[in-house]
Amino acid sequence: MPGSNFEVITAMVEIAPGFKAGKHTHPGTVQVQMLDGEFWLAIDGQPEKTYRAGEAFEVPTGATHNEGALGDKPAKFVAVYIVEKGKPLVQPAQ
């Protein structure tokens, strides 16, 4: 993104069954496309949601949230982060 203070980071993510990330934020938006398994997402102030293969969702900039894998197999997804340059990709919630 020439001339901007943002960068795009694309990651293939695999989360172990039963893993819970703990409340955290990102310095930009996160677009997620589920590939396999089940994944839960709890954004503060919203009901917890479950996502499965073929579904997509977004985590808004700065939204405090928790997440993890459900079931007995890993949750696999592609995450596209559009975040401020030079800031940590993940920040524990205060």
Could you describe each region identified by the protein language model?
Residues M1-K23:
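A short glycine-rich, His/Asp/Glu-containing loop-to-beta-strand
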Residues M1-I9, T50, E58, P88-Q94:
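A short, N-terminal "cap"/entry segment at the start of jelly-roll beta-barrel domains
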Residues G62-K87:
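Ligand-binding loop in jelly-roll beta-barrel domains
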Residues E14, W40, V78-Y81:
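Soluble periplasmic/extracytoplasmic beta-strand elements of cell-envelope proteins
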Residues G3-N5, T25, Q33, L70-P74:
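Extracellular/periplasmic catalytic domains that process cell-envelope and extracellular macromolecules
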Residues N5, I15-P17, G45-G62:
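Short acidic-glycine-tyrosine-enriched beta hairpin
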Residues K20-T29, A63:
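Histidine-centered catalytic micro-motifs
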Residues H26-G45, A53-E55, K85:
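Glycine- and acidic-residue-biased ligand/ion/polar-headgroup-sensing regions
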